[in-house]
Amino acid sequence: MLYKRNPQLNKNGELIHLLSIEGLPKDIVTHILDTAANFTSVSDREVKKVPLLRGKSVFNLFFENSTRTRTTFEIAAKRLSADVINLDIARSSATKGESLLDTIANLSAMAADLFVVRHSESGAPYLIAQHVAPHVHVVNAGDGRHAHPTQGLLDMYTIRHYKKDFANLTVAIVGDVLHSRVARSDIHALTTLGCAEVRVVGPKTLVPGDMAGMGVRVCHTLEEGIRDCDVIIMLRLQNERMSGALLPSSQEFFKTYGLTPEKLQLAKSDAIVMHPGPINRGVEIDSAVVDGKQSVILPQVTFGIAVRMAVMSIVAGNEA
């Protein structure tokens, strides 16, 4: 019954769209991570390509700005030998009032095989997935506050790379959880993979009330939240999504919740520090931590290419 209800899976329980980590079986999440591990060596080859998506057309539709996600999706698709089309939304018919579904219908008429979609409206990738032909696939590159599944997966890949097993890990997610689609995807992924304890850390104004129901421990002080942690995932303040005075100031936030080398000593000595980017140095994290030996922020970006290669190759290989 789970497979039939989940719009990401076909009747055989195979992944045909990646819309959210929520509801994905553990074996599919693990399969994506295992597949990504096989792709990490591609970047070391003289010819950085494999032929898995040769002849396929991948359309990147980013209705919100992006640097890391858009670029790594483009690199990933090209390394899979796909033809990549980056739609310039600012110059597209979307600015002339064309609806999202009409945009998709017209691009589908151009023989699109896979849409990578980032949109400010939660649920936009789901809507698209409901209206594309059976051979067309949709990957969510971030929708509103809802989900950012490939970021969640690359975060899990990073954690597994450095920590191997989730069963004994304590992971803290710190910062603007309220507006973070990454936090939600990370929480779903961590709980699916059997992480021992997930902590959500931030001021009451930036932690949604439903967090406890997601199986996490809520902490409102950084000291409590990161004490004896194995992994710390820092989140930026998403000022562009804030409509009210949720914080006194960025300086006050850094004083209370900013991760400094001194505060990092509360975590385990071999703890790793992660961040989905973009980083705001001196707001949620000190430069000395970003550039320090416990930071794995740049490896996250590198692993993101392999993870996105894995996702696209898997969904494109399955039919609805």
From Swiss-Prot:
EC number: 2.1.3.2
Reactions performed catalytically: carbamoyl phosphate + L-aspartate = N-carbamoyl-L-aspartate + phosphate + H(+)
A biological-process GO annotation: 'de novo' UMP biosynthetic process
Entry-linked Pfam families: OTCace, OTCace_N
Residue sites binding L-aspartate per the record: K96, R181, R236
Keywords attached to this entry: Pyrimidine biosynthesis, Transferase
Pathway the protein takes part in: Pyrimidine metabolism; UMP biosynthesis via de novo pathway; (S)-dihydroorotate from bicarbonate: step 2/3
One MF term in the entry's GO annotations: aspartate carbamoyltransferase activity
InterPro entries, per the entry: Asp/Orn_carbamoyltranf_P-bd, Asp/Orn_carbamoylTrfase, Asp/Orn_carbamoylTrfase_sf, Asp_carbamoyltransf, Asp_carbamoyltransf_Asp/Orn-bd
Cysteines paired by S-S bonds: none
Task of the protein: Catalyzes the condensation of carbamoyl phosphate and aspartate to form carbamoyl aspartate and inorganic phosphate, the committed step in the de novo pyrimidine nucleotide biosynthesis pathway.
Name of the protein described by the UniProt record: Aspartate carbamoyltransferase catalytic subunit
Top-level taxonomy: Bacteria, Pseudomonadati, Pseudomonadota, Betaproteobacteria, Burkholderiales
